[in-house]
Amino acid sequence: MYSFDRNEYERRMKWFLDARFGMFIHWGLYAIPARGEWVRSTEQMEEADYMRYFYEFDPRLYDPSTWVCAAKRAGMKYIILTAKHHDGFCLFDTATTGFKSTDTKLGRDIVKDFTYAARAEGLHVGLYYSLIDWHHKDFPHYGDRQHPMRNRPKYANEGRDFERYLDYMHAQVRELCTNYGKIDIMWFDFSYDDMRGEKWRASELVNMVRTLQPSIILNNRLECSGEGFGSLAQGHPTPYHGDFVSPEKIIPPRGIFDPAGDPVYWEVCATMNQNWGYCGTDNYYKSADMLIKKLVECVSKGGNFLLNIGPDANGVIPPRAAETLEEIGRFMRVNGQSIYGCTKSAIPKPEWGRITQKGNELFLHVYENTLGPLPLFGINAQDIDSIRQLSDGREIPLSHSWVHSDYPDMAFADLGPDPTLVDGTDTVLKLTLKE
């Protein structure tokens, strides 16, 4: 009988909650057609047509240390790679199939290279693993709403042995948990329709993973993928509930809590443009300004932010993505202490931006000027020890202007005769409360 241990849960989640910011990497054969990671499904591509990318795969500029260094410079503390996506192509040396990177012209165990590079730079290591597999002959084809051959009767499922597929899938997860050292996150994807929970033999799978990697943390996608928060949030956790909810491209309005009011931890995953995998015609990139504010929003609500890149067919981060990561990194080098180890504050969201908190330190993320002195709703001036601007450490005094004399129980900060914000995206002030 499974029993949820809140203390153990908090222990294994601590590093994750301190980190707050991570990189997602979607990379595989689909970078060659350059039409996104779902290209085989969206175009209902025959396996023979897709296999030509397998025979071609030889990224001439492949170097995972460049991905890792870009993540580190952007201020990210963990990094997750797609060890296998829905197309079934394995970026690791597996004994279960020849559809793997070591059998391509590249001839490299990409997961091995990646995990080594990440640890060398001090980043926590995560692996994404797709529960579904469009390459395996025993995974449902005809009628499955995701499979490339879903509309072709000649691919009827008679004779397919789903249990044999599950044995294959479990064996691959065992390899990932055995052959690559300490894995900090296993990011499963995804569940839909009746393909969820024990359909994956999920209790058995999670037991194996936790036995091989006792301190690993798991997402909730053995249960659900964006359709509900899962059993932990519902207050009756299953043995395969996972450790964090994984909303995709949406930030929960108020964070996530179970029925008892205890926090359920979560991580928003988001693309930098419109696709996860490389798409050569997708030039709609989110600005660094927007992404910094989304990171702050996640932390101010008690969540993490996992930002994706999709390297091209040569293994190179697209220039626009690389530039955006550099911009984010410049912000994080100055203001990282307002993100790492921080969480939501009991102080209501202010009109001028957001607040993150770590102990008795409040970080005021000021996005825009106010009409007069900066109002600090919910904070009494007598409770404030100091206010400092993170960019240069200068003191920000409290305002004593007559204009707010009608609000004696609320503090106001004086940004000076020229209140121009030093960072047009987010000027961060550290307000320290008296102990």
Task: Mark where each language-model region is.
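Mature catalytic domains of secreted/periplasmic carbohydrate-active enzymes
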Residues: 1-435
